[in-house]
């Protein structure tokens, strides 16, 4: 399970250096093989390949009414291997699609990660913090 936020920088070639605490888990789970695709909220999702295969099957089974979402998730998916130093290449197409600049935030989301442009993430988080908490959280004790 992946959790926590990491502020990182993409290098000049668009590579993300995966934090050590996650790197070891990605190697153990999927031999460093990951899949990146678009998320509808304006970020990228980064899956260990084993988790991606399960997600892909669920998406592929959606009805024709969800065809455009299938295209968004599956049509933009890119398989990448983490290199020997723990870096993942984020393609120019995916970087451009979600507006990734040099400064990014990697969020652990359980079985996958979200990769956000730092300024975009901070703006979305600030807006969410100003809004009322969703009903799904009303039974939680904090």
UniProtKB/Swiss-Prot annotation:
Provenance organism: Delftia acidovorans (strain DSM 14801 / SPH-1)
GO biological process per UniProt: negative regulation of DNA-templated transcription initiation
SUPFAM superfamilies found in the cross-reference section: AbrB/MazE/MraZ-like (SSF89447)
Annotated disulfide bonds: none
InterPro entries: MraZ, MraZ_C, MraZ_dom, MraZ_N, MraZ_sf, SpoVT-AbrB_dom, SpoVT-AbrB_sf
Coiled-coil residue spans: none
CDD domains named among the record's database cross-references: MraZ_C, MraZ_N
Compartments reported by the entry: Cytoplasm, Nucleoid
Self-association and partners: Forms oligomers.
Domain SpoVT-AbrB: 5-51, 77-120
Protein's UniProt name: Transcriptional regulator MraZ
Record's keyword terms, sorted: Cytoplasm, DNA-binding, Repeat, Transcription, Transcription regulation
UniProt xrefs under Gene3D superfamilies: Transcriptional regulator MraZ domain (3.40.1550.20)
Main location: cytoplasm
GO terms of molecular function: DNA-binding transcription factor activity; transcription cis-regulatory region binding
Top-rank taxon: Bacteria
UniProt similarity note: Belongs to the MraZ family.
GO cellular component entries: cytoplasm; nucleoid
NCBIfam families, A to Z: division/cell wall cluster transcriptional repressor MraZ
């Amino acid at each position: 399970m992946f959790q926590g936020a990491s502020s990182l920088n993409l290098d000049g070639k668009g590579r993300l250096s995966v934090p050590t605490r996650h790197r070891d888990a990605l190697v153990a789970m999927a031999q460093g093989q990951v899949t990146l695709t678009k998320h509808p909220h304006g970020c990228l999702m980064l899956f260990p390949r084993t988790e991606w295969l399960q997600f892909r099957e669920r998406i592929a089974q959606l009805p024709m009414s969800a065809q455009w979402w299938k295209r968004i998730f599956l049509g933009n998916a890119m398989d990448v291997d983490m290199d020997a130093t723990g870096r993942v290449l984020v393609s120019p197409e995916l970087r451009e699609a979600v507006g990734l600049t040099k400064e990014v935030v990697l969020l652990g989301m359980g079985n996958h990660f979200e990769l956000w442009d730092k300024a975009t993430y901070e703006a979305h988080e600030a807006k969410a913090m100003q809004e009322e908490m969703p009903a799904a959280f009303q039974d939680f004790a904090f």
